[in-house]
Amino acid sequence: MQTFIHGGGRLPEAVDAALAHYRHQIFVGQLGWQLPMADGRFERDQYDRDDTVYVVARDADGAICGCARLLPTTRPYLLKDVFAPLLMRGVPAPESPGVWELSRFAARSGASRARGARPDWAVRPMLASVVQCAAQRGARRLIGVTFVSMVRLFRRIGVRAHHAGPVRCIGGRPVVACWIDIDASTCAALGIPGASVVPGPALQ
């Protein structure tokens, strides 16, 4: 798995199409999400903007095998606009340059689906790239909505992940707003050197 970062303007057309198709495969095809802006092949929404930061993973054949979307909470973002009821009662959605939203996170590989393979085989390196990318942009915490099972996986890896609100059932599965602390413990668990803020390669 090799990860690429894009955070400067619109995605290149070929990358945009490949990423939207991968997201449709994962979030619509596999997870069965009912997303109003998804068509028969591609998944995009109003948060895919010029200021959106993308982390994209490719396998040895160049095919996309992971993705993540990072949004500054100082601009409109998914949790604040759509999922604010998932936060603790009376707690406003964060608006801070030190907090970024993580959404559309996915990671898979042929090896990770092999019998006996650990489920974090693909998640850990993908999340490491996401955390490092966000930290480079001033983030000290990430927030997002995810499955409760994913929070447990993050914790097993050693990431400082904790609930930002109550568990709710959406689409038949328990989901929760989740904080990820970008601290020494999380960086150590993900194999990120403490002072490592070296930008990754740009998407081509």
From Swiss-Prot:
SUPFAM superfamilies: Acyl-CoA N-acyltransferases (Nat). This is Acyl-homoserine-lactone synthase. The lineage of its organism: Bacteria, Pseudomonadati, Pseudomonadota, Betaproteobacteria, Burkholderiales. GO terms for molecular function: N-acyl homoserine lactone synthase activity. It comes from Ralstonia nicotianae (strain ATCC BAA-1114 / GMI1000). GO terms for biological process: quorum sensing; signal transduction. Its EC number is 2.3.1.184. Keywords: Autoinducer synthesis, Quorum sensing, S-adenosyl-L-methionine, Transferase. It catalyses: a fatty acyl-[ACP] + S-adenosyl-L-methionine = an N-acyl-L-homoserine lactone + S-methyl-5'-thioadenosine + holo-[ACP] + H(+). Pfam families: Autoind_synth (PF00765).
